[in-house]
């Protein structure tokens, strides 16, 4: 799970928080409710995650409650990956 989290973190940092340290974006940092990601940015993250990890996320997985922190996103990815 660590690699999944780090890949997601690096994408968000490079795309939406250029110049920020990875120390400032923890696994439990709220992404949407804090304003780091707006709804369009969240869709971009969904697209990235689906392409990067070869998973299909549905609306349940991508609701604000379930797609608001890096750890939430990583959990959804791991749950959707083939065993």
Briefly describe each language-model feature range.
Residues 16-36, 53-66, 81-83:
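Phosphopantetheine carrier-protein modules
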Residues 68-75:
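Short, cationic-aromatic polyanion-contact patches
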Residues 43:
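Conserved catalytic core of two-component sensor histidine kinases
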Residues 39:
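Catalytic nucleophile serine of serine hydrolases
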